[in-house]
């Protein structure tokens, strides 16, 4: 994934794949991905999937705005000039989405490693979120960085259940 595009077909979410900078759009169907994996295996190449979260999610949030905090008054901007591009991992809908997408992509890719991004989250992206603030209080999490550590451990545990090793930037 990237700000402007989601190039992998996802069965259970609205169609936003093929969006982005390419004038022709485009995406990889699950059959395309399976074919690419077979070709890579013939060449002894492993393909590492990447779902770049929690930031870099502008395109995703255009079709699934429920994954962000609707009442946050913070305007965050990342290095790519996209505003408010970060999902809110404290929301139940976001947790469901994370489990679902990581499971679906893990099932497609038989290789050991799975990349989850984790770079360039705007520093203030979560500080105005009432749900994150409440979650931090309830779980004795002291800072945004500690909350991000909670998030990455949550993702690592999802992927461990699928026998994947997590990679980050």
Kindly give the residue locations of the regions a language model identified.
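Feature activates predominantly on carbohydrate-active enzymes
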Residues: 1-113
């Amino acid at each position: 994934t990237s700000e402007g595009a989601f190039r992998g077909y996802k069965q259970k979410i609205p169609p936003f794949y093929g969006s982005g900078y390419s004038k022709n759009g485009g995406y990889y169907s699950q059959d395309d991905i399976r074919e690419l994996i077979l070709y890579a295996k013939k060449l002894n190449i492993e393909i590492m999937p990447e779902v770049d979260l929690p930031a870099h999610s502008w395109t995703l949030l255009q079709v699934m705005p429920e994954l962000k905090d609707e009442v946050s008054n913070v305007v965050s901007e990342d290095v790519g000039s996209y505003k408010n591009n970060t999902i809110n991992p404290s929301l139940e809908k976001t947790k469901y989405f994370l489990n679902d997408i990581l499971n679906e992509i893990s099932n497609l890719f038989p290789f050991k490693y799975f990349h989850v991004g984790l770079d360039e989250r705007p520093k203030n992206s979560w500080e105005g979120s009432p749900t994150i603030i409440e979650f931090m209080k309830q779980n004795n999490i002291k800072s945004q960085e500690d909350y991000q550590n909670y998030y990455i451990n949550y993702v690592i545990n999802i992927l461990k259940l699928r026998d994947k090793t997590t990679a980050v930037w």
